[in-house]
């Protein structure tokens, strides 16, 4: 579920860059995790980057969003900022990496590190970077 607040305290100003900068850092963290072979953390950091980037768009548009599903966050954007179907499909893939990389009970046995592959982490990072690029156009004008 996504909770959107249409408006913000003008005295506070937009916090769009405050959300987007950590999104960029999370992508960097994802790349470093990929290089280190911690593929589950690379996937999680990629998901976090996309989530924060979309929340930055809400801020840039004078709103706020709560929730963790990148798919639902994208769907809640106003039509002018909403991406096409390809990015929504990538968001669906990223949403799978919100819980799984962190908790062993996401799998029938073993730890998350036993299930994540380099290819999967690379796909997550690529998906995240594409979503960040879309969001960047709405945040950094």
What are these regions (language model features)?
Residues 1-141:
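Terminal alpha-helical segments
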């Amino acid at each position: 579920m996504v909770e959107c607040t249409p408006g913000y305290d003008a005295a506070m100003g937009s916090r769009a860059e405050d959300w987007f900068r950590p999104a960029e850092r999370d992508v960097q963290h994802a790349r470093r995790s990929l290089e280190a072979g911690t593929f589950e953390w690379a996937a999680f950091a990629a998901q976090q980057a996309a989530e924060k980037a979309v929340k930055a768009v809400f801020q840039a548009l004078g709103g706020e969003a709560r929730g963790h599903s990148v798919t639902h966050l994208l769907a809640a954007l106003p039509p002018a900022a909403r991406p096409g179907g390809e990015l929504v499909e990538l968001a669906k893939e990223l949403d799978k990496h919100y819980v799984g990389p962190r908790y062993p009970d996401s799998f029938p046995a073993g730890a998350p590190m036993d299930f994540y592959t380099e290819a999967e982490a690379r796909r997550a990072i690529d998906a995240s970077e594409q979503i960040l690029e879309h969001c960047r156009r709405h945040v950094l004008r």
